């Protein structure tokens, strides 16, 4: 470098603006961490800007020469000393940036090695039946194009195995669920650009809901989002339900008359709706990074709505049987996490659209070298977001992307998706070859659609110059759109071609480079105006730090280049103004530009093309595919401002090129219509493995069912005497179940009770009958007492000794909890009890028997970490017979690869950390008696060698294996159950199956427990944490360093969680239950 005067200038500028802002963490240390839970500073920080320019733009030798010069010329003045000191401090930042870059390279290399090791293991496992054709699939590259069943050949994909969705499906009457949690979602007057959470995704999900509801065969679409009752936002966001009014008929897609008549004949529940579910603080509008601890609360609220809606739709169109969702579609990571849990609870297919991805954002932020991984996680909760995306990949049947680049360069970064492995598994599945329990979601490129109803484009695209002048002069001022006046008031000559940019003032949208390109190109300034639509604002100082910084920089650049009269930047616009803005740019023969560093898709490019505007767009991301389809503009490097200026100048100066791009865009825009999008979407969804609950919800009306229903009534009577007595006596949970009925009162008993007593007197309890009752599918198993319960107390205390054996303290706690419930007559009415444990059912039964507690005292037993659900028989059965729920077994079957998991887990546990050598002795051993068809139970022989859950889950995902792995029983056991099975999910199953509301469940836990402990805390149920009952858990084996935190899973300061002191008696426990019961009101 010839001279270092520019470095000196930067250093002098830093001194002038306040060098105190520099510290060792300016490149990404405490500055970011101090902002935890907040947005960036509200004011532009020039010191930070100059420091980043020096740190990023020079090497150490330049800094060293500058320091030598400062030392040589220093004097006694304080400024010289400060300048010398600052050289040292910035040099330290430069070294730190290089260290972060080195650590990033090491991390990427480790991930690459682990990925290759996973592929190697998969190849070895499947080598015995891997064909040459499949090997070709691994090595080859299969091109991916835009999915469009009716597109032209250039963008047509092979749909030979798929039946294209058409009017022949109009009799299906489907119920579709969409989820988009963050931001401000409403159907009209969307506040797009208000904040970083309310952007293009909000518009997309609302429009896709409307469009799907108009497709043949779709009866109802529910778009779930968060209900916000905060004074910070409009009252409309607190409305629980909003019907999405139908847009006017889409251009080029007019309905036939018979279709309109058919729409009128649909039931009252048909159409598209926004359903707002309250979760998290009711009076606060939370940014998306703060929603994570409340996800399970949303899931429970959404589950309640879906169950009720399915029943209502069943009455309307399902012949009395519930109409379950055809698909549950999550948008973004938070909704993907929710959709995965809902999919598991309902056993219906899940679809995912990422919109933007956490790993991609993490990689970009780390490459900048300004923040450490810990600081990034603190600000963006990025690790929690990434785990949600990984879970979404685990559960999703189908992942919708906008571009091919998103599949290969973004989803390819995830443990749960490998492009090469997906091709192999798809080929094997197509040929009927065993995949050894491995699964990969299918990826489909389906570009977003657009509503053309507000687009008015003249058929003749050859308007001459002066169209805008003609239009504005020939009409009265009142007929000119107000937004036109707002824009034109900035411009000295508003008739020049308009260069239009429309985006949030987000740093990644690269607006400042566009302004520099415009300001430094005099021919472009002479030919065109620049219009910047940068969201809505009242006061820059009240905006988030990043947005405020961009706007401040834009204003300074306008002043630097003296662009007054050439740049328009209105403060406000409505969503309904956007078409008029495009139309204004088109009338002036302008150009639309999207200069973002990376654009996941670029919906505004499609909108602009539909209004006849050629485009200049970034070459990174979705615009590449849009340009390939429309061929209506130029692609540029967003970092090259000269290339941006030249592309804009070329389009506005060459009229023939402008007209050609305009015509191409209008000719091909139909590829991005909503009907086309929805047709392709439904075609893809129809190819998913359809699954839904298999049971029938109505009780058979034959005599046997009636009699068994009366048995349930008898059990009610017995329950009230046995364990819900309120006579004040200290009855234990295992007291006699005999009932004495005074003869004098027999005549006054209700008819149903008398029928029950007559039935029980004539009941034959012989061996043959007992044998019949033990069969799976008997009525006691089908219709247990849970259907009559209004409250359920779920005891999930993980009390074990150091050897992993159940502790007797569990028995004492059970008895004290039951006694506490009996102390409150109101609470005890129609209340039941359930046990939730890692123990297998046989061990649990023996343990209860040893403690003199009958299994009949419980309505349900959730065993083996949620892999099995049992119901006890009636109280007349002294043998304590238990009935396995066969429906639950099929409910959790999804993506369970038992044999493949068994082989891979053994291999992983017997491999040293370097991945090359084998350990001397295996740290685990499969325990057959504790395992079942959906649970692999391992004894941990050496806990110090056990790999943490995060680490094991990553390795299994990289090998295409999906499961729920946990350590339990004081880290002495590891259990592997199906992906969507868990003790927490089993509670949601009980709600779906027996209509026992999760909000009426009370979950009793210790202060710690198995590694699935955190899952049991969150939700709409009430949680009682008993101190001092569980001394040691397994949570130290849950997370690796650098993973998400407990606070990202469990909500803080919630009224739904209460504590009982160590050694608490029934009187204190019941008082805590009373407080919790008020929290749900």
Curated annotation (Swiss-Prot):
Domain of life, per lineage: Eukaryota
Region (Disordered): 116-152, 239-267, 760-780
Reactions listed under catalytic activity: beta-D-fructose 6-phosphate + UDP-alpha-D-glucose = sucrose 6(F)-phosphate + UDP + H(+)
Biased composition annotated in UniProt, kind: Acidic residues: 256-267
Enzyme class, broadest EC rank: transferase
Quaternary structure note: Homodimer or homotetramer.
Protein name: Probable sucrose-phosphate synthase 2
């Amino acid at each position: 470098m010839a001279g270092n005067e520019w470095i000196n200038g930067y250093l002098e500028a830093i001194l002038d603006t306040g060098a105190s802002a520099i510290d060792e963490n300016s490149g990404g240390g405490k500055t970011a961490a101090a902002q935890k839970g907040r947005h960036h500073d509200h004011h532009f920080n020039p010191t930070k800007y100059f420091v980043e320019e020096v740190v990023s733009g020079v090497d150490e030798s330049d800094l060293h020469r500058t320091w030598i010069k400062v030392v040589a010329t220093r004097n006694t003045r304080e400024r010289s000393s400060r300048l010398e000191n600052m050289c040292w401090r910035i040099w330290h930042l430069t070294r730190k940036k290089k260290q972060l870059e080195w650590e990033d390279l090491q991390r990427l290399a480790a991930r690459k090695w682990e990925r290759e090791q996973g592929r190697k293991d998969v190849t070895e496992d499947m080598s015995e039946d891997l064909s040459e054709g499949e090997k070709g699939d691994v090595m080859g590259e299969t091109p991916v194009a835009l999915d469009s069943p009716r597109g032209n050949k250039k963008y047509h994909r092979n749909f030979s195995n798929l039946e294209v969705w058409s009017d022949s499906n109009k009799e299906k009457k489907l119920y579709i669920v969409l989820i988009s949690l963050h931001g401000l979602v409403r159907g009209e007057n969307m506040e797009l650009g208000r904040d970083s959470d309310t952007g293009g995704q909000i518009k997309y999900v609302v429009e896709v809901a409307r469009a799907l509801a108009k497709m043949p065969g779709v009866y109802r679409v529910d778009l779930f989002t968060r209900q916000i009752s905060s004074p910070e936002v409009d009252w409309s966001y607190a409305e629980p339900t909003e019907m999405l009014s139908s847009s006017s008929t889409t251009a080029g897609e007019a309905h036939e008359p018979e279709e309109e008549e058919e729409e009128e004949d649909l039931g009252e529940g048909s159409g598209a709706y926004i359903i707002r579910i309250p979760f998290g603080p009711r009076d606060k509008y939370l940014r998306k990074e703060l929603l994570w601890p409340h996800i399970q609360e949303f899931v429970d609220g959404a589950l309640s709505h879906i169950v009720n809606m399915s029943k209502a739709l069943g009455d309307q169109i399902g012949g009395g049987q519930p109409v379950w969702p055809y698909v549950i579609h999550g948008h973004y990571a938070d909704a993907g996490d929710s959709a995965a849990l809902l999919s598991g609870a309902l056993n219906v297919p899940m679809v995912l659209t990422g919109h933007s991805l956490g790993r991609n954002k993490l990689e970009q932020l780390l490459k900048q070298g300004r923040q450490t991984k810990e600081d990034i996680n603190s600000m963006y909760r990025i690790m929690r977001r990434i785990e949600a995306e990984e879970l979404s990949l685990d559960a999703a049947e189908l992942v919708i992307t906008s571009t091919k680049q998103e599949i290969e360069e973004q989803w390819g970064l995830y443990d749960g998706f490998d492009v090469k492995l997906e091709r192999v598994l798809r080929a094997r599945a197509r040929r009927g070859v065993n995949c050894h329990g491995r699964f990969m979601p299918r990826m489909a490129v389906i570009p977003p659609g657009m509503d053309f109803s507000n687009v008015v484009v003249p058929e003749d695209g050859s308007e001459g110059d002066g169209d805008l002048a003609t239009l504005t002069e020939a009409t009265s001022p009142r007929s000119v759109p107000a937004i036109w006046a707002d824009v034109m008031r900035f411009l000295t000559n508003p008739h020049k071609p308009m260069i239009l940019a429309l985006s949030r003032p987000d740093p990644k949208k690269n607006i400042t480079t566009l302004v520099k390109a415009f300001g430094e190109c005099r021919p472009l300034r002479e030919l065109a105006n620049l219009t910047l639509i940068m969201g809505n604002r009242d006061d820059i100082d009240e905006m988030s730090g990043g947005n405020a910084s961009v706007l401040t920089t834009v204003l300074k650049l306008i002043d630097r280049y003296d662009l007054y009269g050439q740049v328009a930047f209105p403060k406000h616009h409505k969503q309904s103004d956007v078409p008029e803005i495009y139309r204004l740019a088109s009338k002036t023969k302008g150009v639309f530009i999207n200069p973002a560093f990376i654009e996941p898709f670029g919906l505004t490019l499609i909108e602009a093309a539909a209004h006849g505007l050629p485009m200049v767009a970034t070459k990174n991301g979705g615009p590449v595919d849009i340009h390939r389809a429309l061929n209506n503009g130029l692609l540029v490097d967003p970092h090259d401002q000269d290339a941006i200026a030249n592309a804009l100048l070329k389009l506005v100066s060459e009229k023939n090129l402008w007209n050609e791009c305009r015509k191409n865009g209008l000719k091909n825009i139909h590829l991005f219509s909503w009907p086309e999008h929805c047709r392709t979407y439904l075609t893809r969804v129809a190819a998913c493995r359809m699954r839904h609950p298999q049971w029938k919800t109505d009780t058979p009306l034959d005599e046997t069912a009636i009699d068994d229903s009366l048995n349930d009534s008898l059990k009610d009577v017995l329950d009230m005497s046995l364990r819900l007595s309120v006579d004040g006596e200290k009855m234990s949970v295992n007291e006699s179940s005999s009932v004495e009925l005074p003869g004098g009162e027999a005549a006054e008993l209700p008819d149903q009770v008398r029928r029950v007593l007559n039935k029980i007197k004539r009941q034959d309890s012989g061996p043959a009958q007992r044998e019949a009752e033990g069969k799976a599918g008997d009525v006691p198993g089908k219709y247990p007492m849970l259907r009559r319960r209004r409250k359920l107390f779920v005891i999930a205390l993980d009390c074990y000794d150091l050897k992993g054996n159940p502790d007797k303290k569990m028995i004492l706690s059970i008895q004290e909890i039951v006694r506490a419930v009996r102390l409150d007559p109101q609470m005890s009415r129609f209340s039941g009890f359930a046990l939730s444990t890692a123990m297998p059912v046989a061990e649990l039964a023996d343990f209860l028997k040893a403690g003199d507690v009958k299994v009949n005292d419980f309505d349900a037993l959730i065993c083996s970490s949620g892999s099995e659900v049992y119901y006890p028989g009636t109280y007349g059965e002294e043998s304590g017979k238990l009935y396995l729920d066969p429906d639950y077994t099929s409910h959790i079957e999804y993506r369970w690869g038992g044999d493949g998991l068994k082989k891979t887990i053994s291999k992983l546990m017997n491999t040293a950390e370097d991945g090359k050598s084998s350990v001397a002795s295996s740290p685990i051993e499969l325990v057959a008696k504790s395992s079942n068809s959906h649970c692999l139970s391992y004894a941990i022989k050496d806990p110090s060698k056990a790999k943490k859950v995060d680490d094991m889950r990553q390795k299994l995902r990289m090998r295409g294996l999906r499961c729920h792995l946990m350590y339990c029983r004081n880290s002495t056991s590891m259990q592997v159950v199906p992906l969507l099975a868990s003790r927490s999910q089993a509670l949601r199953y009980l709600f779906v199956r027996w209509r026992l509301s999760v909000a009426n469940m009370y979950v009793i836990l210790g202060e710690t427990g198995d590694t699935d402990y955190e899952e049991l805390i969150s939700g709409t149920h009430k949680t009682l944490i008993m101190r001092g009952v569980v001394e040691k858990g397994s949570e130290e084996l849950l997370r690796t360093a650098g993973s998400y935190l407990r606070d990202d899973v469990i909500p803080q300061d919630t009224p739904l969680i209460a504590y009982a002191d160590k050694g608490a008696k029934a009187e204190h426990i019941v008082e805590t239950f009373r407080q919790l019961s008020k929290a749900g009101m």
